[in-house]
């Protein structure tokens, strides 16, 4: 099993799809990585040679992925909360941040409904 960026890449999938199992790499970035490594997008990971997998590793290392990206994301949210700006307050109260309506909807952000006790 090929290991790239600390993640076991599924070998039975095509290179384009297999790279998307890494957090921070979607289809577009996966396509760019395959192009830079001169690897056909439809070639399976199990068919690749060790040198080609090493090229993939080098290309993936150029991007912020996995733990570093998650840490960066949480620190950005924490920074907004510490600044007490509007977006930080919305994050703190678990409400939609980008101006969506909250009279109805916004259930994903707010969580399940709270029962009204009489």
UniProtKB/Swiss-Prot annotation:
GO terms for biological process: translation. One of its GO terms (cellular component) is small ribosomal subunit. One of its GO terms (molecular function) is tRNA binding. Signal peptide: none annotated. Residues 97-118 are annotated as: Disordered. Keywords: Ribonucleoprotein, Ribosomal protein, RNA-binding, rRNA-binding, tRNA-binding. Gene3D superfamilies: 1.10.8.50, 30s ribosomal protein s13, domain 2 (4.10.910.10). InterPro entries: Rbsml_uS13_C, Ribosomal_uS13, Ribosomal_uS13-like_H2TH, Ribosomal_uS13_bac-type, Ribosomal_uS13_CS. PROSITE patterns: RIBOSOMAL_S13_1 (PS00646), RIBOSOMAL_S13_2 (PS50159). It holds the Pfam family Ribosomal_S13. Part of the 30S ribosomal subunit. Forms a loose heterodimer with protein S19. Forms two bridges to the 50S subunit in the 70S ribosome. Belongs to the universal ribosomal protein uS13 family. Located at the top of the head of the 30S subunit, it contacts several helices of the 16S rRNA. In the 70S ribosome it contacts the 23S rRNA (bridge B1a) and protein L5 of the 50S subunit (bridge B1b), connecting the 2 subunits; these bridges are implicated in subunit movement. Contacts the tRNAs in the A and P-sites. This is Small ribosomal subunit protein uS13. The lineage of its organism: Bacteria, Pseudomonadati, Pseudomonadota, Gammaproteobacteria, Enterobacterales. The gene is rpsM.
